[in-house]
Amino acid sequence: MSSRRLLKAAEAIREVVANAIVTEVRDPRVRDVTVIGVEVSPDMREAKVKVSVMGDETQKNLSLRGLQNSAGFLQSKIANRMDTRYTPKLRFEVDRGQENAMTVSEILARIQQEKEGATDDRDQNDSGEDATPHSND
């Protein structure tokens, strides 16, 4: 199957799943879920749905269980939308990209603060040395 067709299928699945989660899935565990992307296997039998979940690890695990319980319903929505021989079996996983980006941002901010603190210390030392009188005896 062409990669272009797989990309189109992945985008269609992402759209159907995202819309169904927002408008049709009634499970409160999936309330804070955002669909980030979908990867479809070459034979179109499996689709890995990457999601982002607001909350702590407990909330993420609950949301994944809620999504897994809703997988059959979501697959039926996909089957109605796509004209393929097989409807992909959905697997859900939390996309850690957002968390990793936040961690990197925090580390960079900390490094920047340390640099600014070191620069301020040097400036104070420099100004202190310049302020002392020099005798030319």
UniProtKB/Swiss-Prot annotation:
Give the subcellular location.
Cytoplasm
Q: Which Pfam families match?
A: RBFA
Name the residue ranges with Basic and acidic residues bias.
112-125
Q: Is-annotated flag, keyword Cytoplasm?
A: yes
Stored InterPro entries = KH_dom-like_a/b, RbfA, RbfA_dom_sf
Q: Name one GO cellular component term.
A: cytosol
The entry's keywords: Cytoplasm, Ribosome biogenesis
Gene Ontology biological process terms in this record: maturation of SSU-rRNA; ribosome biogenesis
GO MF, one example: ribosomal small subunit binding
Annotated stretches, region: Disordered: 110-137
Subunit relationships: Monomer. Binds 30S ribosomal subunits, but not 50S ribosomal subunits or 70S ribosomes.
Q: What does this protein do?
A: One of several proteins that assist in the late maturation steps of the functional core of the 30S ribosomal subunit. Associates with free 30S ribosomal subunits (but not with 30S subunits that are part of 70S ribosomes or polysomes). Required for efficient processing of 16S rRNA. May interact with the 5'-terminal helix region of 16S rRNA.
Q: Which family does it belong to?
A: Belongs to the RbfA family.
State the name under which the record lists this protein: Ribosome-binding factor A
